[in-house]
Regions:
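Short acidic, hydrophobic short linear motifs in intrinsically disordered regions
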Residues: 338-357
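Minor-groove-contacting beta-hairpin "wing" of winged helix-turn-helix DNA-binding domains
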Residues: 385-390
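Short, amphipathic alpha-helical interaction segments positioned at domain boundaries
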Residues: 392-407
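Transmembrane alpha-helical hairpins and terminal membrane-anchor modules
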Residues: 214-299
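A short, conserved structural fragment
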Residues: 370-384
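Short alpha-helical segments that sit at the start of domains
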Residues: 292, 296-340
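Soluble catalytic regions of membrane-associated enzymes that act on cell-envelope
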Residues: 359-371
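Basic, amphipathic N-terminal segments
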Residues: 1-224
Length: 407
């Protein structure tokens, strides 16, 4: 199986570092450094204002079904999950998350778990499920093998970030809801880090741990062998006695069986030994399952980054960073190029720069970056499709006018 991840839209560097890399590139003189920094600061301020408005809309649309809400409403509010989703999905796209399709999720559910745990998710309890991921990469992990006697290296596809949105059905079974402390029709929004692609099912709130065939065999085979030993040593005399009683009662022989005190003690001792053995095997099974649940819980504890409203606060910050980086890069490469460029040429130059300077395979979002520059009037497009950046002095003036128009 080819584990090579696709080129990513997400730019895995901070906007401050991207700005410094542009300044260190050597194509701007010292006077232009200050002007370029000022242009970048104004762009960041404009994007920050836009995303602040997005944040307010998200807070308003989420408040009616926010499970962590600690404020009171002045009047009854209707739940509008659709309005929230209409705000959330474009935000995830701006933050360069990719949607996990139903087919991708189905494939992930069929793959072997990295943690060697068999998990089951009941999707019939959900009215709506959304999964988004960002930063797919190939990682290597050391995992135990041969019953823990040795370890070996395995490669697996990993998501750096995963967002999951779940809305439970309004007609969720009351017993199920009470057992899992879930309110019918409620919503869960979570953000996780470092999630193996094959273990996406562990993120769902109703995930149950099941024993794999190998785990059942590890308990069952030794149990069968030791059980045979118990029966032959502890229950042999008891079985002979019970067989004689059964034969006498069924008329298979006429010799009566005497049940004296010694026979009764042997009978109950044998039954007690078998009962004790069965109880021990049941506890072995239960304890092994508890260890699996503990392993799952520990993994989720360290992978969970945020919940509910905290998730879209983080996403707002991520999306704002991505918008700033894309705009700064596109403007810088147009500004420092000796002639006008087409969108394709600009895209290829930026991606080549990341590959050669930063050893990073990037699928730069050229269309989105140019849309921002055009909206800010920082780039002009000729009839033949070539693009030219506005010089720094005019760009500063234009951005300043945009800022003044906000208030």
């Amino acid at each position: 199986m080819d584990l090579k991840p696709p080129a990513k839209r997400f730019i895995p560097f901070r906007k401050r570092d991207i700005l410094q890399l542009c300044l260190d590139d050597g194509k701007l003189d010292q006077a232009q450094h200050t002007a370029f920094r000022n242009c970048s600061s104004l762009m960041q301020a404009l994007f920050h204002f836009e995303f602040h408005q997005r944040l307010e809309r998200l807070k308003d649309s989420f408040s009616s079904f926010n499970p962590d809400r600690d404020t009171h409403s002045l009047k009854p509010e209707e739940k509008h999950c659709d309005a929230f989703i209409q705000e959330l999905e474009p935000l995830l796209d701006k933050a360069n998350f990719e949607k996990v399709s139903e087919a991708d999720l189905a494939r992930a559910l069929c793959e072997d778990s990295l943690f060697k745990i068999k998990l089951h998710v009941d999707f019939d309890e959900f009215a709506e499920v959304l999964l988004y991921c960002r930063g797919e990469s190939i990682r290597t992990e050391s995992v135990p093998a041969l019953f823990g006697l040795k370890r070996h290296q395995v490669q697996f596809a990993n998501y750096d970030r995963v967002v999951i949105y779940i809305r439970f059905k309004d007609d969720l079974d009351p017993k199920t809801a009470a057992a899992r402390d879930i309110k019918p029709g409620s919503v869960i929004l979570k953000l996780f880090k470092n999630v193996p692609k094959a273990d996406l099912e562990m993120l769902f709130p109703n995930t149950t741990v099941r024993m794999r065939l190998i785990d059942k065999l590890m308990i069952g085979v030794p149990a069968a062998i030791s059980g045979g030993v118990v029966i032959s040593t502890k229950l042999g005399a008891t079985l002979v006695l019970l067989g004689s009683l059964f034969g006498f009662w069924m008329g298979m022989h006429s010799t009566p069986v005497e049940l004296d005190k010694a026979a009764l003690i042997a009978l109950f001792a044998g039954l007690g030994a078998v009962g004790s053995y069965l109880w021990k095997q049941f506890n072995n099974f239960k304890n092994r399952k508890l260890r699996f649940v503990q392993s799952l819980t520990q993994n989720l504890y360290f992978k969970n980054l945020d919940n509910n409203a905290g998730v879209f606060h983080r996403l707002i910050d991520d999306a704002e960073e991505e918008e700033c980086k894309e705009a700064i890069l596109a403007y810088y490469f147009l500004l420092t190029h000796s002639s006008a460029m087409t969108a394709t040429e600009l895209d290829q130059q930026i991606e080549r720069w990341f590959r050669e300077i930063l050893n990073c395979e990037l699928d730069f979002e050229i269309d989105d970056a140019l849309d921002k520059l055009k909206r800010l009037q920082l780039v002009s497009e000729a009839p033949n499709g070539t693009l030219t950046a506005m010089p720094l002095p005019q760009a500063l003036s234009t951005l300043d006018q945009h800022w003044d128009q906000l208030f």
